């Protein structure tokens, strides 16, 4: 029967286990860190901290470019460490404890708790929390094992190379990423919505944002000056299409400023042809990004929209295109509507609008039972004190902020925002 290990042997065993446990801890943390590292985050760190020439930076760059080899190195190291710890403990316990069953159980429990809990679960959690710090701090040690196991990792990488095709980043991936940033509080709902709209900006077609021809205010080339002036004054548009009555084609646009300047200078012999701006033609199937570029190149604020049969079906302005990104734009000449849609989940609402009409249509069906109560009285009934003092109200379904009219402070509007997780 073997005698119990001597003090020196016991010291060597303990130190060996501590060293192996440390190695396992490092590579486990490194595995999570290298997996969690994103290229943009790493590049930002290098640029911000001026670490381009550091050896650790070059090592981490190499690991990113040879991710499979790095991961194989970590897995091999971890498995070897686990086997060595288990064998060392088995030999030590076998010499110390006479009962083989008890020795095996203690070996399993000690090595299992030590390796799984303290050398894998805990370091992996810390590696995910401190990604860059972990990578930089232990780059040299992991690279040491990378060199030791290079023949194995190289051979394995060559075998796996034909199966290793990195998946391209899709729009859906970017959407998930934006949603995650929004949930972490770095983006507001409006910011994330704007970015998402920017991503699909080149997919939106002109026919979605154009003004249909039946809603367009226009004049004929042979209309009287007074009639055209009346059109401008009534419609409050800065530009107007001019149509040739003979061909029924748009021959150009006139600008309000040019028209009234010429009218004042020479009202009797004003020639409309001299005021015309050339027509920019776009197809209804044209992406708005391309239409915007075409309008900018031609320095045109408006474009005529034709269908595939070259029939004029509407017009589109730069404002229409920009509103697709930022939401509805109202200027000082627009009439104040009872309900102004600023975005798909944001509205400006007058106090006298019926609460049932607005909330049941846009927030949630059957939210308001009474058909006669106004929004002003409905909101006041929800929370009198805080709403009256702070001019703000927050509910599980929506939030409200009181907006004073810029010209008349006694007039107010309610900015109502629907919560993103509410389904109408």
From Swiss-Prot:
Keywords: CBS domain, Cell membrane, Membrane, Repeat, Transmembrane, Transmembrane helix. GO terms for cellular component: plasma membrane. It is a multi-pass membrane protein. It is found in: Cell membrane. Residues 6-191 form the CNNM transmembrane domain. The chain crosses the membrane at residues 7-27, 71-91, 101-121, 135-155. Disulfide bonds: none annotated. Its main location: membrane. Belongs to the UPF0053 family. This is UPF0053 protein MG146. It comes from Mycoplasma genitalium (strain ATCC 33530 / DSM 19775 / NCTC 10195 / G37).
């Amino acid at each position: 029967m073997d005698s119990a290990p001597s003090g020196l042997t016991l010291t060597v065993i303990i130190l060996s286990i501590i060293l192996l446990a440390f190695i396992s801890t490092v590579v486990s943390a490194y595995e999570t860190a290298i997996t969690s590292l994103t290229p943009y985050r790493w590049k930002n760190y290098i640029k911000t901290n001026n670490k381009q020439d550091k050896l650790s930076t070059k090592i981490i760059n190499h690991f990113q470019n040879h991710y499979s080899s790095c991961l194989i190195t970590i897995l091999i190291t971890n498995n070897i460490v686990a086997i060595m710890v288990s064998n060392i403990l088995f030999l030590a316990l076998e010499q110390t404890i006479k009962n083989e069953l008890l020795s095996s159980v203690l070996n399993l429990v000690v090595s299992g708790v030590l390796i799984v809990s303290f050398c894998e679960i805990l370091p992996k959690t810390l590696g995910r929390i401190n990604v860059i710090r972990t990578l930089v701090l232990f780059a040299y040690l992991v690279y040491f094992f990378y060199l030791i196991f290079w023949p194995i990792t190289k051979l394995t990488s060559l075998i796996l190379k034909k199966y290793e095709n990195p998946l391209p980043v899709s729009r859906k991936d970017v959407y998930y990423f934006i949603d995650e940033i929004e949930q972490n509080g770095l983006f507001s709902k409006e910011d994330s919505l704007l970015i998402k709209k920017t991503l699909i900006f080149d997919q939106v077609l002109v026919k979605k944002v154009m003004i249909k021809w039946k809603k367009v205010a226009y004049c004929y080339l042979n209309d009287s000056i007074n009639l055209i002036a009346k059109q401008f004054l009534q419609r409050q548009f800065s530009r107007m299409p001019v149509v040739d009555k003979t061909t029924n084609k748009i021959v150009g646009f006139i600008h309000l400023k040019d028209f009234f300047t010429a009218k004042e200078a020479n009202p009797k012999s004003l020639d409309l042809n001299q005021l015309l701006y050339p027509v920019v033609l776009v197809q209804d199937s044209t992406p708005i990004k391309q239409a915007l570029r075409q309008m900018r190149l031609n320095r045109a604020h408006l474009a005529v929209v034709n269908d595939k049969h070259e029939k004029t079906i509407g017009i589109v302005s730069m404002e229409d295109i920009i509103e697709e990104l930022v939401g509805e734009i109202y200027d000082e000449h627009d009439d104040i509507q009872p309900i102004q849609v600023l975005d798909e989940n944001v509205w400006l609402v007058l106090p006298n609008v019926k609460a049932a009409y607005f909330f049941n249509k846009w927030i949630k069906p059957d939210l308001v039972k009474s058909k006669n109560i106004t929004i002003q009285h409905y909101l006041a009934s929800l929370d009198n004190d805080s709403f009256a003092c702070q001019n703000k109200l927050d509910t599980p379904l929506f939030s409200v902020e009181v907006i004073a009219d810029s010209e008349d402070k006694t007039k107010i509007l309610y900015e109502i925002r629907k919560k993103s997780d509410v389904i109408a």
